[in-house]
Curated annotation (Swiss-Prot):
Residues 36-180 form the RUN domain. Residues 466-545 form a coiled coil. Residues 346-357 have a biased composition (Acidic residues). This is Sorting nexin-29. The keyword Coiled coil applies. The modification Phosphothreonine is found at T641. It holds the Pfam family PX. It comes from Homo sapiens. It comes from the Eukaryota. InterPro entries: PX_dom, PX_dom_sf, Run_dom, Run_dom_sf, RUN_SNX29, SNX29_PX.
C-alpha cells in the first residue's frame, strides 16, 4: 500500500470517527438521556474507535503471537485469535487490578472481546481521554506494536483522539461490557465443515506463498472450497460407514465416541512448527502432481484400490448429484498406490446408527475416489455401492479412523499439477514412486453440465464468498451509506430551511395578531366612545322633548282664560287629533335637526381644539429644547418638570438663572503625555466665567458628591476608559455626558441649598463647590477676558466649533 493510500485511509478513519462523535453529541450531548449500546450511534462510535485502534497493528507480536499459536494448537483458541488485536497494546498500560477485572468477565473469552470491553468501560467511566493520553505518550512502545503508517503513529491525527474523547464526557454512557457478542463471531463446537474449511484456508495460504501458477492456485482453492462448503454439519440420512485400522481400534473408538460425543479439536495446517511435532509430511513431485500422506509411525493402512463407483441411491433413497472416481490402485504392489494416513476425529453427527455401521463395515474394502461418472446402480449390492465416497481428508487426532465425506460437487485439476504441500521439514518425507500417477477429481453433473453454483445448497452461499466479493460488498455498502448520508444532509438542510420559513411565518402571524388585537382595542374604544356619545344625545333629546312639552302646556294654559265667554259659559276650541299629532311630529323633527346640528358643530370644534392643542404642545416642546440649548437646563430638565402646567410655569418663573455648558475640548501636552481639557462655561445672571478641567478632576468631584449627596449615584457619569480615550468620537460623547452630569448636579444644589437658590452668586457657588473656581490657564493674561456682552452673541448652534480660538474666553461657545 502506497503512502498516499495510507494517508487516505487515515483521513477516512478520522472523518468517520469525527462523524460518529458528532452524531452522539447531537443526540445525547447536554441531555439527561442515557446512551446505551442499543442505539446505533453508540454502536457506530465504538466501531470507529475500534477501527482506529486496530489500524496498522503489526503481525509479529513476539510472545503474544507465540502464546496464541500454542493455545490454538492445544485446542483452547480459535483461528481468529492469531489475528493482531489492540488489546495486546492496551493491556501494557493497565495495572494489575484493571487486568484482573477484564480477565474475570464471565462472557468475554477472547482478546478481541477484552479490547472491546475495555473501550466500552472507558466510555462509561469517562476515562477514555486519560487512557488515550497514556497510550499515545510512549512512541517507542507504539512503534513496537504498530506500523509506521498506522493511524496512532500519525501525530497530527492521533493527537485529536483525546480531544474527541474529552468531547464525549458530557454524555452519560451505559454500555454493557460483559456481553458475549463482544467476542466477535461466536464459534460453537466445530463441525466437519468448520474443520475442513480451516484446512482449506491453510492450504490456500500455503499455495499463495508457493511458486505455482495462478491457474493451479485457483483450481486448488476452488476444489477445496467446494468440498468444505458442501459438507453439512448435520446429515439427515444415516451416517456413512467409517473404516477402522483394526478391530480393537474400532471397538476402542466406539467406546470413546459414546463417552465423548462433543469433544473436537481444531488443528491448523499452516504452522510448520506444529507439523514438525506431528511428523506428517505432504509432498508431491514437481512434475507429476502426485500427493502422498505418510505418518511418523509408518503404520498407515493402504485402503485405496481400483474401483469405479457411480453415485446411486444411498441408504435413504436419495440420489447423489455428482460422482467421484480415483485411479486404479491395488494392494499387491503391482501398481502405484496412494497411502492415506488418517487421524480420527470425533464426529458429533454419528449417533444412533453407529453400531450397525461399524458392524457392517468391518470386513469390507472401501474405495474413496472415482475418475469418471458411471451409470447409477439399480440395486444395493454392497455397502460401497450404496454410498458415494468423496476424497478423504487427513485430520489428526489420537486415534486412527477414516472419515468419509459425501461429495455433492467436485472439481478436477487433472490438467495442472497440484502445488507442493509441505507441512513438515523432518527427514521422513516420502514421495510416491510412480510419477505418472495423478490425483484427479473430475466434475460431473447428472444433467447437461449445470454449473457448480446451481448445485450448492442455499445455506452454504454466504460461506463461499471470497475476500474480493466481501470487499466489493463492503464497498457497495459504504457507497450506499455515503449516498444515504448525503441524502440525509440534503433532507436536513431542507428541514432547516422549512423550519426557518415556518418560524418566520409564525413571527409574522404573531405580529399580525398583535396588530389585529390593537385594532380591535382601538375599535372597541371608538365603539365605547360612540356609545357614550349616543347616551348623551339620548339624554339631551329627552331634555329637549321635555322642554317642548312644557312650553306647549304653558301655551295652552295661557289661552284658557280667553275661552270664557261674557255670559260665563266655557267654550272649548275644537281641534282635530290628527292636526295635534302632526304639529307634535313637526316640532320634534325641528328640535332633532337643531340638536344634530349643534352636536356636529360641537364635535368639529372639539377636533379643531385637539389639533391646535397638539400643535401647541409640539411647539412648546421644541421651544423648551431650544431654551435648554441656549440658556442651560431648567430645574430638573424636561424629565423632571412637573406635569401640572401651573407648577411648571411656577418653576420656570422662580428658578435661579444659573447655566452650565461644556462647549469644547482641547488636547494639551505632547504625544506621550497628551490629555484632553474640557472647557466649562458657567453663567449666573450677568456674571460668567470659564474653567478648564481634566477628566480626573470631574471624577474626583463625582466621588466627593457621592459622599455628600447619595442621590448623585443615580446620575449618569461617564466611566473611565484606558484604551481608545483619545478617539474624537469618544471624546465628543464624553463631553455631552459630562455636560448633562454638571447640569444635573447644579439642579441638585439648587434644590438642596435654598439660600443659594434665593440669591445665586459666583462666590456662593465657589464656596459650595470649589470645582468651579476660576483659574486662569497658563499663558493667558489676567485682563484678557472681554466683556460678556461682546462674546455672548456667539452662542448660536450654527457657529462651527472648529473656528474657535485655542484659548476660548468667557461666552465663547
Amino acid at each position: 500500500m502506497s503512502g498516499s493510500q495510507n494517508n487516505d485511509k487515515r483521513q477516512f478513519l478520522l472523518e468517520r470517527l469525527l462523524d460518529a462523535v458528532k452524531q452522539c453529541q447531537i443526540r445525547f450531548g447536554g441531555r439527561k438521556e442515557i446512551a446505551s449500546d442499543s442505539d446505533s450511534r453508540v454502536t457506530c462510535l465504538c466501531a470507529q474507535f475500534e477501527a482506529v485502534l486496530q489500524h496498522g497493528l503489526k503481525r509479529s507480536r513476539g510472545l503474544a503471537l507465540t502464546a496464541a499459536a500454542i493455545k490454538q494448537a492445544a485446542g483452547f483458541a480459535s483461528k481468529t485469535e492469531t489475528e493482531p488485536v489492540f488489546w495486546y497494546y492496551v493491556k501494557e498500560v493497565l495495572n494489575k487490578h484493571e487486568l484482573q477485572r477484564f480477565y474475570s468477565l464471565r462472557h468475554i473469552a477472547s482478546d478481541v472481546g477484552r479490547g472491546r470491553a475495555w473501550l466500552r468501560c472507558a466510555l462509561n467511566e469517562h476515562s477514555l481521554e486519560r487512557y488515550l493520553h497514556m497510550l499515545l505518550a510512549d512512541r517507542c512502545r507504539l512503534s513496537t506494536f504498530y506500523e509506521d503508517w498506522s493511524f496512532v503513529m500519525d501525530e497530527e491525527r492521533s493527537s485529536m483522539l483525546p480531544t474527541m474523547a474529552a468531547g464525549l464526557n458530557s454524555i452519560l454512557f451505559a454500555i454493557n461490557i460483559d456481553n458475549k457478542d463482544l467476542n466477535g463471531q461466536s464459534k460453537f463446537a466445530p463441525t466437519v465443515s468448520d474443520l475442513l474449511k480451516e484446512s482449506t484456508q491453510n492450504v490456500t495460504s500455503l499455495l499463495k506463498e508457493s511458486t505455482q501458477g495462478v491457474s493451479s492456485l485457483f483450481r486448488e482453492i476452488t476444489a477445496s472450497s467446494a468440498v468444505s462448503i458442501l459438507i453439512k454439519p448435520e446429515q439427515e440420512t444415516d451416517p456413512l460407514p467409517v473404516v477402522s485400522r483394526n478391530v480393537s481400534a474400532d471397538a476402542k473408538c466406539k467406546k470413546e465416541r459414546k463417552k465423548k460425543k462433543k469433544v473436537t479439536n481444531i488443528i491448523s495446517f499452516d504452522d510448520e512448527e506444529d507439523e514438525q511435532n506431528s511428523g506428517d509430511v505432504f509432498k508431491k513431485t514437481p512434475g507429476a502432481g502426485e500427493s502422498s500422506e505418510d505418518n511418523s509411525d509408518r503404520s498407515s493402512v493402504n485402503i485405496m484400490s481400483a474401483f469405479e463407483s457411480p453415485f446411486g441411491p444411498n441408504s435413504n433413497g436419495s440420489q447423489s448429484s455428482n460422482s467421484w472416481k480415483i485411479d486404479s490402485l491395488s494392494l499387491n504392489g503391482e501398481f502405484g498406490y496412494q497411502k492415506l494416513d488418517v487421524k480420527s476425529i470425533d464426529d458429533e453427527d454419528v449417533d444412533e446408527n453407529e453400531d450397525d455401521v461399524y458392524g457392517n463395515s468391518s470386513g469390507r474394502k472401501h474405495r474413496g475416489h472415482s475418475e469418471s461418472p458411471e451409470k447409477p446402480l439399480e440395486g444395493n449390492t454392497c455397502l460401497s455401492q450404496m454410498h458415494s465416497w468423496a476424497p478423504l481428508k487427513v485430520l489428526h487426532n489420537d486415534s486412527d479412523i477414516l472419515f468419509p465425506v459425501s461429495g455433492v460437487g467436485s472439481y478436477s485439476p487433472a490438467d495442472a499439477p497440484l502445488g507442493s504441500l509441505e507441512n513438515g521439514t523432518g527427514p521422513e518425507d516420502h514421495v510416491l514412486p510412480d510419477p505418472g500417477l495423478r490425483y484427479s477429481v473430475e466434475a460431473s453433473s447428472p444433467g447437461h453440465g449445470s454449473p457448480l453454483s446451481s448445485l450448492l445448497p442455499s445455506a452454504s452461499v454466504p460461506e463461499s464468498m471470497t475476500i474480493s466479493e466481501l470487499r466489493q460488498a463492503t464497498v457497495a455498502m459504504m457507497n450506499r451509506k455515503d449516498e444515504l448520508e448525503e441524502e440525509n444532509r440534503s433532507l436536513r438542510n431542507l428541514l432547516d430551511g422549512e423550519m426557518e420559513h415556518s418560524a418566520a411565518l409564525r413571527q409574522e402571524v404573531d405580529t399580525l395578531k398583535r396588530k389585529v388585537a390593537e385594532q380591535e382595542e382601538r375599535q372597541g374604544m371608538k365603539v365605547q366612545a360612540l356609545a357614550r356619545e349616543n347616551e348623551v344625545l339620548k339624554v339631551q333629546l329627552k331634555k329637549y322633548v321635555g322642554a317642548v312639552q312644557m312650553l306647549k302646556r304653558e301655551g295652552q294654559t295661557a289661552e284658557v282664560p280667553n275661552l270664557w265667554s261674557v255670559d260665563g259659559e266655557v267654550t272649548v276650541a275644537e281641534q282635530k287629533p290628527g292636526e295635534i299629532a302632526e304639529e307634535l311630529a313637526s316640532s320634534y323633527e325641528r328640535k332633532l335637526i337643531e340638536v344634530a346640528e349643534m352636536h356636529g358643530e360641537l364635535i368639529e370644534f372639539n377636533e379643531r381644539l385637539h389639533r391646535a392643542l397638539v400643535a401647541k404642545e409640539a411647539l412648546v416642546s421644541q421651544m423648551r429644547q431650544e431654551l435648554i440649548d441656549l440658556r442651560g437646563p431648567v430645574p430638573g430638565d424636561l424629565s423632571q418638570t412637573s406635569e401640572d402646567q401651573s407648577l411648571s410655569d411656577f418653576e420656570i418663573s422662580n428658578r435661579a438663572l444659573i447655566n452650565v455648558w461644556i462647549p469644547s475640548v482641547f488636547l494639551r501636552g505632547k504625544a506621550a503625555n497628551a490629555f484632553h481639557v474640557y472647557q466649562v462655561y458657567i453663567r449666573i445672571k450677568d456674571d460668567e466665567w470659564n474653567i478648564y478641567r481634566r477628566y480626573t478632576e470631574f471624577r474626583s468631584l463625582h466621588h466627593k458628591l457621592q459622599n455628600k449627596y447619595p442621590q448623585v449615584r443615580a446620575y449618569n457619569f461617564p466611566p473611565k476608559k484606558a484604551i481608545g480615550n483619545k478617539d474624537a468620537k469618544f471624546v465628543e460623547e464624553r463631553r455631552k455626558q459630562l455636560q448633562n452630569y454638571l447640569r444635573s448636579v447644579m439642579n441638585k444644589v439648587i434644590q438642596m441649598v435654598p439660600e443659594f437658590a434665593a440669591s445665586p452668586k459666583k462666590e456662593t457657588l465657589i464656596q459650595l463647590m470649589p470645582f468651579f473656581v476660576d483659574i486662569t490657564p497658563p499663558g493667558e493674561p489676567v485682563n484678557s477676558r472681554p466683556k460678556a456682552a461682546s462674546r455672548f452673541p456667539k452662542l448660536s448652534r450654527g457657529q462651527p466649533r472648529e473656528t474657535r480660538n485655542v484659548e476660548p474666553q468667557s461666552g465663547d461657545l
